[in-house]
Regions:
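Glycoside hydrolase catalytic-domain context in secreted enzymes
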Residues: 1-476, 480-584
């Protein structure tokens, strides 16, 4: 419908170009999920990467999406960095070969087909070795090292594989933000690598010149520097209204030229032309049911997973397992959890867990978690042991809360949920720009603001409600967010996670008394980009006693530990390389 509107009802009839994340599968709930990039690197087989790219492209184009923000070609030189799993590791040669193979699979021989997409490489460049492993921090590499180790990976993808576009990175190199680096974005990218398409800034990377790097005095100067350097497309830096206003101002005062604006426009139009969108902007609607998560793609995902498993040690020839084993304990927080890796959605189809796979291989009936041994199979016992982070926070349900009345916006005390007041800026001064009813406090605002009225760069939220638990129990109440949050109950500050020096993700003991009304106030400030905002509870501390007992009683214990979406991914950087949370 959107494409039809653009083509048939706008003045110039220029088709839309839709993009999506597709790091190891299209970012859709029904799409095939392939192994994460770091896992792919373990096979050392570019052909597998090309196969994956080809299948991801087919599923993507079948959904009328034309460009993918993939692959990630950063060299991960600091394992504390939360995005390490998105890369092919630290090696320039291996990353070059695997990245180029994915690009060839995605783009094929011709972009203007119903099974190919444009590849937008990221994050150009030097992004994978930030100071302290902190996402978006300046790189520890100097310019010489970036050109020696990082740039050849992108060169291979552009020059040898023909990648179309790129997303420039957040970081600075020797104090100069990449987003305003003319040599990197124009001289090398267009002059040497001959990239045919456009440069997109990473999300808010342009405005970060003003807010983080402090290399631009104003948002306008930040935009001007980016345009001059060779950035063609913004990514949620400015509202459309502000973007147009600033562009007009800069054209009027000579900060940028019409030639520069025309050049950026032509680059975007060129990509649309390469994709064949002017001739055929629509998709064959029968393709989706035939292609997305089809049997061929499922089989290939399984093959890749099997070929990328890495055995670090086989002490005392433990593998293959002896058929004489009669009791197996499957333990750990990841044993019955499908760990898919960052940048994929939770699938709407069933994903087989380690526990389920072991039971299937051994012929244990699927309906039983614990099954006694018999002649045909051993006994399988399972226990989670612990939550990775100790507190498995569950968002509090809306029917536990009655909103605080706001007659002016139609909120009454009989409404379930929270009265939410949104303020632009770093505090709660002035009047809220938006007051609404929020059913829960369970948000992810990294990709979009809560509302068009809210400034995604800096805003605060105050939620108020009366809480009444449907039953009495001893548990814990708390917050989960990398941003600033605090919790008040009956006017008392219960959790203080306000400011960069404090931790908002906390759980505190709390007795939920049935029938008692608690006055609740939760406050939030997006000083870490709003990737996770939760107000919730759990039923108290867990115990590992059962897991220990199972391990002692069994002939073999298979323990699944490690990271999860709670501990690894964008903005989940590490201070230690120990097993996270309570697993040690």
């Amino acid at each position: 419908a959107l494409q039809k509107y653009a083509k048939e009802q706008t003045r110039l009839g220029i088709p839309f170009l839709f993009h999506e994340e597709a790091l190891h599968g299209l970012h859709r709930r029904d799409a095939t999920i392939f192994p994460q990039q770091l896992t792919l690197a373990g096979a050392f087989e570019p052909a597998l990467c090309e196969d994956m790219g080809r299948m991801v492209a087919a599923e993507t184009r079948a959904k009328n999406i034309h460009e993918v923000l993939a692959p990630v070609l950063d060299l991960a030189r600091d394992p504390r960095w939360g995005r390490t799993e998105e890369t092919y590791g630290e090696d320039t040669y291996l990353s070059s070969k695997l990245g180029a193979a994915v690009v060839r699979g995605l783009q094929g021989e011709d972009l203007a087909t119903d099974h190919t997409v444009a590849s937008e490489l990221k994050h150009y460049t030097g992004y994978g070795n930030p100071i302290g492993g902190l996402n978006c921090a300046p790189t520890t590499m100097g310019r010489h090292d970036v050109f020696s180790y990082c740039m050849p990976v992108f060169e291979e993808a552009f020059v040898k594989a023909g990648a179309t576009d790129t997303m420039c990175s957040y970081n600075s190199i020797d104090g100069f933000p990449v987003v305003s680096d003319h040599e990197i974005l124009t001289d090398v990218l267009r002059g040497t690598y001959k990239m045919p398409g456009f440069v997109r800034s990473d999300m808010t990377a342009i405005i970060m010149q003003h807010t983080a790097h402090h290399s631009a005095a104003t948002p306008k100067e930040a935009l001007q520097k980016a345009v001059k350097a060779g950035v063609d497309v913004q990514f949620a830096d400015y509202s459309h209204e502000e973007y147009r206003r600033l562009m007009k101002e800069m054209l009027a005062d000579g900060s940028i030229t019409m030639e520069e604006l025309d050049t950026s426009t032509a680059r975007v139009l060129r990509v649309k032309d390469m994709l064949g969108l002017f001739e055929n902007p629509y998709v064959d609607e029968t393709l989706e049911s035939k292609v997305v998560h089809c049997k061929e793609h499922q089989d290939k995902a399984l093959e890749i997973a099997q070929k990328t498993v890495v055995l670090l040690k086989n002490e005392n020839n433990m593998l293959p397992l002896s058929r004489s084993i009669r009791k197996i304990a499957v333990l750990g927080p990841n044993a019955n959890l499908p760990v898919m890796g960052d940048y994929c959605m939770e699938p709407d189809y069933h994903a087989v867990t380690l526990l389920e796979g072991i039971r299937e291989v051994l012929g244990v009936p699927a309906e039983n978690v614990e099954t006694a041994a018999n002649a045909s199979h051993p006994e399988i016992v399972y226990d989670k042991g612990c939550n990775i982070l100790g507190a498995e926070i569950k968002p509090l349900e809306r029917w536990w809360f009655n909103a605080k009345p706001r007659p002016a916006v139609g909120i009454t005390e009989i409404d379930y949920g929270f009265t939410a007041e949104y303020f632009n800026g770093a505090d709660f001064s002035g009047e809220p720009v938006l007051t609404r009813l929020d059913s829960q406090i369970n948000f992810n605002w990294i990709y979009h603001a809560p509302d068009d009225k809210v400034d995604s760069r800096q805003f605060c939220v105050r939620w108020t409600a009366t809480m009444c638990s449907p039953k009495s129990f001893e548990g814990r109440i708390g917050l989960s967010s990398p941003d600033s949050m605090r919790l008040y109950i009956d006017g008392e500050l219960v959790i203080d996670g306000w400011g960069e020096d404090k931790e908002a993700s906390q759980m505190v003991p709390f007795f939920f008394e049935s029938g008692r009304k608690y006055d609740v106030r939760v406050e939030f400030r997006n000083d870490a980009r709003g990737v996770r905002v939760i107000f919730g509870y759990d039923h108290g501390e867990e115990t590992i006693d059962r897991a220990i007992r199972f391990a002692k009683e069994s002939d073999l214990a298979i323990v699944a530990l490690g990271d999860s979406t709670e501990t690894s991914g964008e903005n989940f950087d590490r201070t230690t390389l120990n097993l996270p949370g309570k697993q040690l």
